[in-house]
């Protein structure tokens, strides 16, 4: 198998993305997935915490080739997409649902020296059967209580890069309810 890069994009998986500055502002610079990022520029990462009316959070389990761990839905906006549009695209690609008419709340955003990021929150009720998962990326989706998520954090069952997202969302919701 030939490793993917934009120069040998035989399968049509070329993914061009915009680069951002340290203030999370889009620049005129772009890069292709897998290419090195020039100094002083950052890719945008978007993530979403979806919570149902029972207080449970939707988690997705990645295929083994992508770590095989649980995490929230997320990814990188394609070139020309805003972070919001990228989040809508990622949710549609990975979960098979359209959230373009839903009210998303940003609960955290910034740049951490590696990535720029926007973290979104959505309160919505979906039945697991509503999801049409992207089988190349996911094996299952499931609703989890905050207690179960805390246990999964302690046992390392969650994607370590996304524990911060879950904790920030939980803190956001606690502040919002007061």
Where are these regions (language model features)?
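Acidic pyrophosphate-coordinating catalytic loop
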Residues: 36-41, 108-119
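The catalytic Nudix box helix
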Residues: 59, 71-106
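Nudix hydrolase/Nudix homology domain
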Residues: 6-11, 65-70, 79, 112-178
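Acidic, metal-coordinating catalytic segment for phosphate/diphosphate chemistry
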Residues: 3, 8-47
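A glycine-rich, hydrophobic loop/mini-helix early in the fold
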Residues: 45-70, 74
């Amino acid at each position: 198998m030939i490793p993917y890069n934009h120069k040998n994009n035989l399968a049509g998986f070329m993914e061009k993305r915009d680069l951002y500055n340290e203030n999370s502002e889009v620049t005129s610079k772009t890069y292709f997935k897998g290419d090195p990022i020039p100094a002083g520029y950052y890719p945008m990462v978007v993530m979403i915490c979806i919570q149902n009316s029972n207080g449970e959070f939707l988690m997705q389990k990645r295929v083994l080739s992508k770590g095989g761990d649980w995490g929230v839905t997320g990814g990188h906006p394609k070139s020309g997409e805003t972070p919001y549009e990228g989040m809508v695209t990622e949710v549609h690609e990975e979960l098979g649902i359209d959230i373009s008419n839903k009210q998303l709340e940003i609960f955290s955003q910034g740049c951490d020296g590696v990535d720029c990021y926007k973290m979104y929150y959505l309160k919505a009720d979906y039945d697991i059967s509503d999801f049409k998962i992207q089988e190349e990326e996911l094996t299952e989706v499931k609703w989890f209580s905050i207690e179960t998520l805390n246990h999964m954090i302690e046992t390392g069952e969650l994607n370590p890069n996304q524990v911060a997202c879950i904790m920030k969302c939980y803190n956001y919701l606690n502040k919002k309810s007061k």
